Amino acid sequence: MPPHRPRIGILTGGGDCPGLNAVIRAATKAAERLGYEMLGFLRGFEGLAEPVAYEPLTPRSTANILLQGGTILGSTNKGRFSALVGAGDRRQIDPELLEQAARTLRELSVTGLVCVGGDGSLAIAQQLHEHGLPVVGVPKTIDNDLGGTAFTFGFDSAVACATDALDRLHTTAASHERIMVLEVMGRHAGWIALHAGIAGGGDVILLPEIPWTFEEVCAKVVERDAAGKRFTLVVVAEGAHLPDGRLVHDGGQGEQRQVRLGGIGEIVAREIATRLGREARAIVLGHLQRGGTPTAFDRVLASQFGAHAVHLVHEGRFGQMVRYRPPHIESVPIADAIRTLSQVDPASSAVQAARALGIGFGDAPAAASPYAHPGPRPGPPHCPPRDRML
């Protein structure tokens, strides 16, 4: 019986998002063309340890998953594998688990493992790499807050979902002269809120990176009223701090020790209603932003990531993460990528353009001059340590 071809493994860790299946499909097709068999490990990193769980992947079995949301391999953001990311807050994975994973790859003749995930999943991948496993990373987060890459797939789809919600809220807000507050995802970074707020015609955008006050938010509503616009759309990232610096959470915990954020939209709506005597409603998109069909941009980006990851394995360039550095797909050490947080720059062209359009960010008028050149800025305000786990 002839020996089987060399194998490449792939897994998806952390929260799901549109585009994961596009990565799996692209990696499988690229591996086939280079003479590899593809194995998909199930339920994230859990599939590497006892009981080992995997299934063969072929171009035929992955032929129809390009437009499918979620991940055919399953995923988990809990379990035995976990690695916190942050200053002095990195959890070491049990050495026995690391050895189980290494043994699994050896016994299955897997020459390289493609790990698709966010900062927490890539922190796990880095520990596997440090243990000697042949690992390559693919970045995934709808928040777009992972350092080392200009964009991650899933982000554009999440923005499209939030933009569609704003389009729909616009008509009902205008009809009933209401203030509508849309809460979107964005734990440490306001990328979704910023892009959706611009694309969906928002009037106020509240971000983790820009301090704001209720007085300025209400002033924007009053300004619109005076101009004959008796409705206002407010977009707020779930990680936007209250004016006193506090984060709003729902009292529970999400992934292991991570505090689950949520509720800032309701607080903003209630405060506006109290201060102005106007009707204000809050809407939370939540996991709707993670589901559904990926946009064309996300399909293209995910496909490029998957193909490039396989080529990194083929070239033996382990410990690297693929990244998008327009216009090229490149790679960067995983350790470097998970060390930095990508946040919205308050002086960026996108923020300046939004201000020029009349969009408010809840900050003082002196800080709201579009296309100003304030000189060097300190780091983003309220920048928390990287304590997320995916």
Model features per residue range: what roles?
Residues 1-13, 21-109, 116, 120, ...:
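A cross-family phosphate/adenosyl-ligand binding-site feature
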Residues 11-12, 41-42, 74-75, 115-117, ...:
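Short beta-strand segments
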Residues 25-34, 54-61, 127-137, 153-157, ...:
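A glycine- and small-aliphatic-rich helix-loop capping segment at beta-alpha/alpha-beta transitions
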Residues 35, 39-42, 128-152, 156-159, ...:
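Short, acidic/small-residue loops that bind anionic groups at enzyme active sites
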Residues 104, 115-117, 123-127, 134, ...:
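Accessory alpha-helical/coil subdomains and C-terminal extensions
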Residues 281-289:
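Glycine- and acidic-rich phosphate- and metal-coordinating loops
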Residues 302-314:
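Flexible loop/turn connectors
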